[in-house]
Amino acid sequence: MTEKEKQQAGELYNGNDKELVAERVKAKKLCVEYNAIEYNDYQKKTRLLDRLLALRGENTWIEANFFCDYGYNIIMGDNFYSNHNLVILDCAEVIFGDNVFIGPNCGFYTAGHPLDYKTRNQGLEYAKPIKVGSNVWIGGNVCVMPGVTIGDNVVIGGGSVVTEDIPSGVVAVGNPCKPVKELPKEDVPEAGEKSEDTPEIAPSQQPLKAQQAGAEKPAAAPPKPKKTRRVIGIEEISKK
């Protein structure tokens, strides 16, 4: 097996493999290019995301700065929004459902390292996938660790470190992150359902010209992405 095949199989692999290094360099360059794009150039940003990510839905907006390891392991559903300084270490798949909102300074880390220092010092590491359901709000400064699944209709409190799976329909917070409250049934939309109060693009996502004009939507309608996929909810995600 190649080191990349070992990586995708969840086995220990050498992160310094030439093929993997070249792919990370390519992704980092695209991230730097993305972060340098003028803030309100929505079309240019989305075109670059189509080059970087595996799949994305409609109304994708990621505030600069954004960094990832490979890009081709990341899938985003419709109405994805992240505030500044999102980091996704996608050595394995990272899948987001629809209507996912992420606060600033959040990280999703699939990468892990052996506890044995002799093995670790050889450059060996492993990766476990991360899955996030639909209708999820993640507060600022949250870390999501390797192998975690977050259900549908979940709120993760700011500053949390998510080390274990979080079930659907709860508020969870802490280090380690634990459910502290169940969301009322009437406050929980069906997975994939969009609230009437949720705009297609949140005000902070709108290009500056549209905001200055008081428009509810961007001045120019963004083109449909070349690659789209409806990610309905955690049950569908779990089939991956």
Question: Where are the model-predicted features located?
Answer:
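Flexible, glycine/small-residue-enriched loop-and-beta-strand segment within the central core
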Residues: 39, 66-149, 170, 175-192
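Short secondary-structure boundary/capping segments
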Residues: 4-5, 52, 122, 129, ...
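Short conserved AdoMet
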Residues: 54-57, 149, 167
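Terminal amphipathic alpha-helical/low-complexity segments used for targeting or macromolecular assembly
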Residues: 1-59, 177-181, 185-240
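Short arginine-rich
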Residues: 33-35, 165-169
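Beta-rich strand-turn-strand
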Residues: 139-165
